[in-house]
Regions:
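Short hydrophobic/aromatic-rich motifs at helix boundaries and adjacent loops
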Residues: 1-5, 66-68
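Generic detector of isolated residues embedded in canonical secondary-structure elements
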Residues: 14, 32, 57-61, 71, ...
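N-terminal, post-signal-peptide region of Sec/Tat-exported proteins
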Residues: 40-80
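Short, charged low-complexity linear motifs
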Residues: 9-10, 77-80, 84-85
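Sec-dependent N-terminal signal peptides
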Residues: 3-13
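Non-cytosolic coordination micro-motifs
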Residues: 16-51, 81-167
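Basic side chains
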Residues: 2-3, 30, 76
Length: 167
């Protein structure tokens, strides 16, 4: 009987897991994430209803994973790439891997946001890997009031397919 229950849990976990994050499901709590990532660290959040937990340096070229929990339920995963090690060649490799494993993006959206004297400019590509998850591949530059780029970042955002994407 224990084997049947264990088999069911294993099949459930891997059948409904978030793409690229085996064992993690939408709606998981911090406690569930802690089982897979024992070194979760709380990050500051501008939204009091959202807690952000991160894992530093989980893989090569990745600075950290960020897990966004609203009401203690996972509703977004952000992969923050290490901008010191990502160049044009690595960017192309990431894009090629996405298009090879998922397919071509279904949408390209420009990003243009003014925040005080800074401007965020970039693009995001929307991928649909399955019926439960959407993936957004986003490159964003921060431009100061003098028109100079002060920062540049690259993200992969995973969200449940029923959620609206807000950068």
């Amino acid at each position: 009987m224990k084997k049947i229950i264990l088999l069911f849990l294993t099949i459930y976990t891997f059948s409904f897991s978030i793409r690229d994050f085996n064992g993690i499901n939408w709606g998981d709590s911090k406690e569930n994430l802690s089982i897979l990532f024992s070194n979760l660290k709380k990050e500051p959040s501008i939204n009091e209803n959202v807690n952000i937990f991160s894992v530093k340096n989980p893989k090569e070229n990745i600075k950290k994973y960020e897990f966004y929990l609203q009401n203690n339920a996972l509703n977004k995963i952000r992969v923050v790439f290490d901008k010191e090690s990502i160049g044009k060649r690595e960017l192309q490799q990431i894009y090629n891997q996405l298009t090879t494993t998922i397919g071509v993006p279904v949408l390209k959206l420009p990003i243009y946001k003014k925040i005080d004297n800074l401007t965020l400019k970039g693009n995001t590509l929307k991928f649909v890997p399955d019926t439960q998850t959407l993936i957004y591949f986003t490159g964003i530059d921060t431009i100061n009031e003098l028109g100079k780029m002060t920062d540049s970042n690259l993200y992969l955002d995973y969200i449940p397919s029923q959620n609206e994407y807000i950068f």
